[in-house]
């Protein structure tokens, strides 16, 4: 009993408080969004309460595991996650592996419901890439361009195969989350700056060329380049770049812009949102918040997210070992991309992707994955405090 009390005292109270605010906001926003009548008698708010209860239990379990043990478990967790993605790929469409909106991303279990392996694989990739960097740095104390290039090669070797499988589901958004996590870990790994510039320069150059072609030669962009994409990707690009011209493809973008704009500064009030957005309790929950809470509440939520990210960075910066620092960096990368992509698509700055707003959107797999990541953060904080305590005693 005393051990449990000591463990709870070691948890980062500020991070827990921020998560509690997001928890309450999520449940309230989901409850309000389901009042529009499109969901029948389904109570997603109650389900989200259950999801959060389970999520906090998962958080505490992971937070109680030492970082050294997590590092040792990196390979087994990765292998289990990779195998689950392979199984999902090879099994035919069925009630166990359903195809929803043209994508086969889930296992559907009795009672438990749908589970998305790619969501949980984020943690496996975070753990293994961070562990790989730590071991590589210990092996090659004298850093050279060749050793840094070898490190990137190792990371690509364990990242590309699962990323390709996830991309084929199709789930492009999840692949970008993997890339964000890996990029942040590589950035903090201590590799030479010229290699970072080289790695960052390639996608920036490609993006710049695409923007130039879009502005100067729109016919080539739409008739030659966009047509190279898959049909669902073409639809999202067209709906993003000109939602009012391509009304079918850009319907969700139109409606979310209408919801955000109609909220004004103070909002319409709780439960008074009347703009219809398909599945607004999931990826478009921020539109509900902006419509009913207005600019004031929307800005408050954005500030809470920045507080969360800054708290994780502080914990990562004060971590007692490189492994903990790299985990924090990777998690910040994942959350930042989710945050900016989701809010960006709500206000029309980014294309619509199946990326949930972390801790606010309804969903079990996404929330559980994020809470497990917070458990990793708290484990880093706990380990650091234990380290400091032992030094003081010595």
Cite the ranges covered by each PLM segment.
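A juxtamembrane structural motif centered on a specific transmembrane helix
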Residues: 1-8, 30, 342-343, 347-394
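Membrane-helix boundary/helix-loop-helix interface segments in multi-pass membrane proteins
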Residues: 2-4, 28-29, 37-46, 50, ...
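Hydrophobic alpha-helical transmembrane segments
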Residues: 50-58, 121, 292-312
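Structural signal for the C-terminal ends of transmembrane alpha-helices
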Residues: 57-68, 130-138, 183-192, 307-316, ...
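Interfacial segments of multi-pass membrane proteins
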Residues: 176, 180-195, 273-297, 356-368
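Hydrophobic, glycine- and aromatic-enriched re-entrant/interface helices and adjoining loop segments
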Residues: 200-297
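Loop-to-helix entry and N-terminal half of a specific, functionally important transmembrane alpha helix
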Residues: 314-353
